[in-house]
Amino acid sequence: MKKTVVIGAGFGGLALAIRLQAAGIPTVLLEQRDKPGGRAYVWHDQGFTFDAGPTVITDPTALEALFTLAGRRMEDYVRLLPVKPFYRLCWESGKTLDYANDSAELEAQITQFNPRDVEGYRRFLAYSQAVFQEGYLRLGSVPFLSFRDMLRAGPQLLKLQAWQSVYQSVSRFIEDEHLRQAFSFHSLLVGGNPFTTSSIYTLIHALEREWGVWFPEGGTGALVNGMVKLFTDLGGEIELNARVEELVVADNRVSQVRLADGRIFDTDAVASNADVVNTYKKLLGHHPVGQKRAAALERKSMSNSLFVLYFGLNQPHSQLAHHTICFGPRYRELIDEIFTGSALADDFSLYLHSPCVTDPSLAPPGCASFYVLAPVPHLGNAPLDWAQEGPKLRDRIFDYLEERYMPGLRSQLVTQRIFTPADFHDTLDAHLGSAFSIEPLLTQSAWFRPHNRDSDIANLYLVGAGTHPGAGIPGVVASAKATASLMIEDLQ
């Protein structure tokens, strides 16, 4: 019996496979690595657990919906723990902001920066909530297959001033530069430059205020495992170490999926959660549609890459918050260099993940696991030798953290590893080593983004960061909902 094939067991691929299997469509999930999760890979070392990728869950309802439509309860598969504060934001001046969901507490902290910005923040939150209603709840999981779909959304996008950038939008309401940074950095979580990404992405703030920030007990990998178990409980099949080499096309339909090990899967439909550029360039590079799409996609602007440093310490550093944003001395200038620069900047801003604050089980007793990441240019802009640059940047980051945030860090090191743009390219098959696929510019969003269903190869579908609506766990899970709606309609 032919089965529907989903390529890639990242969050998008898993969510799509669950929706298809729950709808009665026999589905096989092909994952090239030895574990599911895609970017949400997990490493274990000397009793430490390291989530490799996404760590911020802001829409638990989208995940719960996957279990509910399958007639199951999410809490029987994975438990989500609340994160408080959502983030601690730190500046080199010594100023800090604990961003939490308590309005009175948050406004009291805003007053310390600029009393006039309390009212401005209230107006910004109302604006963000309006964008959230339109951009996420109404349009986030609707496939934009024709330009008419874009035109229908146009009036509301104009009303919300979607042509403005995230930073411009925040600045309409808020005066203090620290607070402008605090409420504009969110687009970086999905690969967007706050100074060029559409103000639609201010919806992330409302999303967090609506449902909170959560972390899976046992780490993000525990959520991946729960989703895999749900899929297999429904009768789905998952194949690991299954690298797809080619999509065989006959009469403008994918008829077979060929693996690198020689196996062949006959199929009625294929959805790719693989890198969108390489889906067309590598898997369909022999076909005119693949060549045409790949050439067009290679002209698009890609999001930044990341340098990630994982480390385990024999001290818990309980003074830290779960999520800490460490702003460097520059904001606009540094971000410009991250997105357009041809070299590493002399400074950096960091995201520090301290999951043992919420779940101490991720490290041996008295210890803690961490990761810290620095946004950096992708390989297309900065083709650096990361075998040389990686250890040097690691040492700079360790020095910075030890001086400002984690006294004694180097003497407490038990284990460490780095993951560079070269690893994004080589291990994750990410075009140019981009961490978030196509940059979320307004001219690369919705209909302008690769469509959830290909317009020429009738049974080829896309899911994940490279299609609508975009990157981040809420984005790729929403893309799975959009793509599933098309596939279920086409296949049933």
From Swiss-Prot:
An individual GO BP term: carotenoid biosynthetic process
Domain of life: Bacteria
Keyword tags: Carotenoid biosynthesis, FAD, Flavoprotein, Oxidoreductase
Documented EC number(s): 1.3.99.31
Catalytic function, reaction form: 15-cis-phytoene + 4 A = all-trans-lycopene + 4 AH2
Entry annotated with the keyword Flavoprotein: yes
PROSITE patterns: PHYTOENE_DH
Cofactor(s) required for function per UniProt: FAD
GO MF annotation list: oxidoreductase activity, acting on the CH-CH group of donors
Enzyme class (EC, first level): oxidoreductase
Protein residues bound to FAD: 5-38
Pfam families hit by this protein: Amino_oxidase
Pathway listed: Carotenoid biosynthesis; lycopene biosynthesis
Family note: Belongs to the carotenoid/retinoid oxidoreductase family.
Function: This enzyme converts phytoene into lycopene via the intermediaries of phytofluene, zeta-carotene and neurosporene by the introduction of four double bonds.
Name of the protein in its database record: Phytoene desaturase (lycopene-forming)
Species annotation: Pseudescherichia vulneris
